[in-house]
Amino acid sequence: MSSPSAAPDTEPTDPALAAEQRHLADARAALARMRDRAAAMDAAAAGDWVSAQYLESTFALRRKALADDPTVPLFFGRLDYADGDYAGESFHVGRRHVSDDEGEPMVVDWRAPVSLPFYRASAGEPMGVALRRRYGFLHGALTGFEDESLVAGTGQRDYSAILEAEIERPRVGPMRDIVATIQPEQDVIVRADLSRSVCVQGAPGTGKTAVGLHRAAYLLYAHRDQLRRQGVLVVGPNASFLRYIGDVLPALGEIDARQTTLAGLVVGTLTSLHPKAALRREDPADVATLKGDERMATVLANAVWSGLVPPAEGLVVPRGASRWRVPAWQAEEIVASLRARGVRYGAARAMLPQRLAHAVLVKMEEAGDSPDDRVQDAVARSRPVRAYADTLWPAVDPARLVLRLLSDADFLATAADGVLTPEEQALLLWPRPGRAPGSAPWSLADAVLVDEAADLVAREPSLGHVVVDEAQDNSPMMLRAVGRRASTGSVTVLGDLAQATTPWGVRSWAAALAHLGKPEAVVDQLTRGFRVPGEVIEFAARLLPLIAPDLEPPVSVRRTRGELVVTRVPALVPALVGVLDEVLARVGSVGVIVPDALVGPVVDALEVPHAVVGSSPDVESATVEFDSRLDVVPASLAKGLEFDHVVLLEPADLVAAEPDELTGLRRLYVCLTRAVTSLTVLHAQPLPDALGPVPAA
């Protein structure tokens, strides 16, 4: 094994290390030539303007995918095959494929079948590989490597200094990929077939978010043509989280996946109907919980279909000198047959004129005429038929329907009869009736209802694959909104029931998968933590018997590093300033996690450069968030983030800020598990009883 810590700017004395460094330089040069060839492609050679635009877009994406970041290693491993189809060959495994001028691979994509043994092979099952090599890098320069023999009887290493160093590498900036450190149990999930929906119950630090993103990258590689047509969507809990994970897929060469929040999805539906509509308020917890209840789907369906009007009289269609009649009873039968088809409201409405016209056509044939399809089409388009159809089957604006439902007590009572109690109906009604969708006081839960109503009217097109993170915090109605985006596709569901911090969130994965429309999905548990130090996760796990008694406690693989300090102080903010002087002297990122109410006082007291997570509301806006070494993090936004060093203020206030103690303890569990190297807890009030005695220093 070559030393992983060899200085990158000195000439290596190890010939093998020198050879690997030359291969890295040659591979970078080859990648540059690949990009030059892509840049030289001329879309003007296309036969027409449309083709030229398509080719130019394709070439631009190709050039972007071939961009090289000199600080990121082109490869991180090597496989030397001894048996099978690749016997005698060696392959360098990296984030993307790189080939020389003759097309021979210099680096193979980590997602290629030939790379699979890098993640799965063992001494017991070597998969044809004799040697697995891992590389150490510093700022993109190759500094060393270590070899692991997989030949039977040679004694497999179960410890990798390079692997541990990569896992523990200090974090500054947004989330990075884990492609060099994917573990076998993670890789099984990453490479699950596109047709299979998976649910990952992952304890803190098990890499569930990274696994979900790498699964998206793998599926885009393995099913590129299909998913380029159908689309891949990543749904995160908030804009700050999307900023944090936003660089992972591009770093893996994937730029085709769309990333958004659930609010982005449903508000997109609302504004597509009424461009001036916007979220203007937040619901109280009990109201939001009721609006997120699955029973609201029945209420909305009742409201949508209540618009059908029984015919008061028959249809009369003048044509030439004749007047053709469809009696009211027959029109009612036609409406009932369309309703029984089980299609969307809007689709059935579009069929009605043709069905009425066909009834007229039958009358013509019975009278001895010989009409054809052209006559039926003309009758269906005629003014009497269109007007009659519009009367029986009025158009429905989903936003106006929900606005009426939340403003009109009588309309709500009719739609919710037998579904919601009178008390629940009263809770749903807005304090002041809305006037128009563009100016209505919509909440996020209201927008979810509009999204449901819109799907009842016209089917939401399905994507090929959807990844939803922090799924445990979504209500049944929110999960239905995600699920209909993958009605004919598959999903990757990520979350941790112990970290559920919304009163409307689901309490079991079986329920969540049912709401997503994927009850057949298998739940995979990740309990081996690679990020959170052992003593930190054990301290946080004291809360599990109360917040998630059915879950297995996480086990950290990191026993040699990490630091936990719990200190009672007379005054929080002065103590924080003193602690930060010490923590900022260390290497790595620092997160100060505070109850939301303390963000202002803490920010005012800090005299060192810092950023505030969540300070930029627009996910697309430029921001220093996560680019600073020091971030102040409201507890409500801590989920999914990680920092080398975390300073957590006043757990008691953090718990008390939530609607109930259970939610507060779950929020505390989230905040306690954000640290990669050290956790310092400062408190002036007594710690919550569930944390037990203070750990010995």
Name each region found by the language model.
Residues 174, 178, 208-212, 352, ...:
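Phosphate/oxyanion-binding active-site loops and adjacent basic polyanion-contact surfaces
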Residues 2-34, 38-41, 155-158, 163-279, ...:
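P-loop NTPase Walker
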Residues 182, 467-468:
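Short hydrophobic beta-strand that contains or immediately precedes a catalytic carboxylate
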Residues 1-179, 183-188, 689, 697:
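Extended, charged low-complexity regulatory segments
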Residues 183, 187-194, 217, 390, ...:
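Amphipathic, well-packed alpha-helical segments that form the structural scaffold of globular domains
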Residues 205, 293, 345, 349, ...:
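Short beta->alpha junction loops/turns
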Residues 225-226, 230, 239-273, 279-280, ...:
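Conserved helicase motor core of SF1/SF2 NTP-dependent helicases
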Residues 99, 220-466, 472-481, 489, ...:
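Alpha-helical nucleic-acid-binding subdomain
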